[in-house]
Structures are given as C-alpha cells and as structure tokens.
A protein has these predicted regions:
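Short secondary-structure boundary segments
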Residues: 11-22, 105, 215, 219-228
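Conserved ATP-binding subdomain of kinase catalytic cores across diverse folds
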Residues: 1-19, 28-55, 62-68, 73-186, ...
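Acidic catalytic cores of enzymes that act on phosphate-bearing nucleotides/polynucleotides
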Residues: 187-261, 271
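Short, exposed beta-strand "edge-strand" segments with a Pro/Gly-rich flavor and a Y/T-containing core
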Residues: 61-63, 222-223
Length: 328
C-alpha cells in the first residue's frame, strides 16, 4: 500500500476525519515531524503490527506491564502530587491517554525515536527564529542524543533491578535535582509555583487560569483557551461530575486546542474547592483544576486487542488504572 494511504487510514481510524478536513490537530501535525510523531501513535503500532518496524522477537518474551503507550519527550513533566494543595513536586509521565497493558519495548522504542525528532525540531526552531537569544542558545548535538538514548535504556534496566531488590516501588519518585542537572532550573520554577511558593499567586496554573480579581472565583475570559458553556449545560456537567471530585465544583469551562494526539477531543476544566473561598494564598491552595476529557481507545489496542483482559476495561477506567501505576 502507498505510504500516504496508510497514514490517511490511520488518521481517519483515530480521528474519524480525513486530513482534507484540516482539523487543528492535523494542521499542528503537519508543521513538524516531531508534532506528526506525537499525533500519530496509532500509526506506529500499525507499523509494528505489519513488520515495518522490526523489533527483535526476544523482547516479546518479557512479561507484559503497564505502559504509557504514547511515550515521548513531550509527555513528561513536573506535577505536584495531590493537586494545588500537595507539597511534593515530582518529575513523571504526565499523559496517559494511550496507557494500557503492553510490551515495555514499545515505550522504550517510542521515547528513543522522540529524542531524535525533538532534537531536529529544536534545531529547526532555532534556525528559523528571528530571536537572537534563541539562536544563541546551545543546541543538543546528535552525539548527545545517542548518549541520551543509551542512558535511557541503561536507567530502565537499573530501575527494573531496583524494583526486584525492593528499593524502588510505586511510592518512589524523582523529587530533587542538583544544580548541574538539566532539570534543576525547571524544578526550582516548579517549587516556586506550588502552594506556599513565591510565584504561586502569579505563575501557578490556578493563577494563570482564574480571574483572581473577582468573587466568586471563576475561570478567566480567554477566547484562545476557553469556550464558555451555556448555563444549563454547565449545570448538568457540574452535577454529573460532582461525585468524582473531593470538594465543590465552583466553575466549568471547555478547554480549546490543547495537546496534540488528543487535540480534537472535547475536554473541560473543572475548578474544584470549598464553597466559600477567596483569592488570597491561604485559601487559593485549597482549590485545584481538574481536567475532564473524552477518552478513546488506547493506541496500541487497535492492532493488539488481545494482550490482556485488563485492556477490556472501558477506555476511561483503563487510563486511570494505568496512571495509578505509572505516575509514581
């Protein structure tokens, strides 16, 4: 089959529209090989299933495990445990849309490919930028990417060994980074944006997304990010999701143009907190934002539907179950 027809079929299978419709997701994917890779996880699994990507069979003799499914450099980041009122900042996978029970080599392969694509993506951004500061920043070399890929595999094996020894478990996490580490500055920024941090009221997710000048607390009016919801529909959504959150839903908006792979999926932001709350730091940290998103089948399962009975859970439950195992 002509390659473009395979791509077309896989995009239509997942997104339920052809590229000719020019949805935002496909436009974003067309702008960069890295973005295309991020938005086409199902295509990779199709290529694995038909043998176009040749993975050594010996790797399939290893036990199945929880996998991210769409494991790439863009799906890791800093998150505070327990939302805004958590006091632990961890570095971990942060997107589980395609998580399921699967073969660990799929995550390792996908992440390794993403290292090379992200390096090229950043190189292209730098070469085509008019920003002198950006053009002068050091760029990761291909040799460094080679070293990073090998280090990633080594650390995975090391983590497996520690798990067997009992020194690594689902309560373990990356929580600190020394000054020489590439993530140190971002870790410090994350700490400042947490509740109690110097930048909590200016740079935290709550501060960026909420209108802190008005009472009661509400999401900002921002046509680029949020779509207001008709009052009756908003009331229905808040009533429907109230049993699943740990406090009162104070407001609800539809989030626009977020993500890449799931860019075309409807999603909502819920503001959750005490019924009576104001915008000062002592009370704002009692609130948090919950993302509610339409969930679809994990990408590996289109081509590998019989890996595990656990994968027969509905898509939302499977995602949550895997996230519990993978995010710590």
């Amino acid at each position: 089959m002509i390659r473009k027809n395979t791509i077309r079929e896989q995009l239509q299978l997942v997104d339920e529209v052809t590229p000719e419709h020019s949805i935002n997701k496909h436009i974003k994917m067309a702008s960069s090989p890295f973005f295309f890779f991020r938005g086409s996880a199902a295509l990779m699994y199709q290529d694995i299933a038909c043998g176009l990507i040749d993975i050594p069979q010996a790797l399939y003799t290893l036990p199945l495990t929880n996998i991210v499914g769409d494991c790439h450099t863009g799906n890791f980041g800093f998150i505070s445990e327990e939302g805004s009122h958590g006091d632990t900042l961890i570095f971990a996978p942060n997107d589980f849309d395609d998580a399921c029970i699967g073969n660990m080599i799929w995550d390792l392969f996908r992440f390794t490919v993403s290292l090379y694509l992200s390096q090229k993506h950043c190189q292209n951004l730098q070469e085509n930028s008019d920003d002198l500061k950006l053009r002068q920043k050091p760029l990761v070399t291909e040799q460094q990417v080679d070293s990073a890929a090998l280090a990633f595999f080594d650390q995975y094996l090391h983590a497996c060994a520690r798990s067997i020894e009992g020194t690594l478990n689902n309560q373990s996490a990356l929580t600190e980074f020394d000054k020489e580490h590439i993530l140190h500055k971002r870790w410090q920024k994350g700490l400042q944006r947490m509740a109690g941090g110097a930048a909590f009221l200016t740079s935290s997710t709550l501060a960026k997304e909420l209108d802190l000048t008005k009472a009661p607390l509400r999401f900002k009016t921002n046509p680029q990010r949020f779509e207001p919801i008709p009052e009756q529909h908003k009331s229905d959504l808040m009533k429907h999701f109230s049993p699943y959150v740990d406090n009162t839903i104070l407001d609800c908006v539809e989030r626009l143009n977020a993500g890449t792979g799931s860019n075309n999926m409807r999603r909502y932001y819920l503001l959750v907190g005490p019924k009576q709350v104001n915008s000062d730091a002592s009370q704002l940290n009692l609130c948090h934002i919950v993302e509610v998103k339409q969930q679809r089948r994990a990408a590996p399962l289109h081509n590998f539907p019989s890996l595990s009975p656990i994968n027969e859970l509905n898509a939302a439950h499977l995602t949550v179950n895997c996230q519990r195992k993978l995010s710590t």
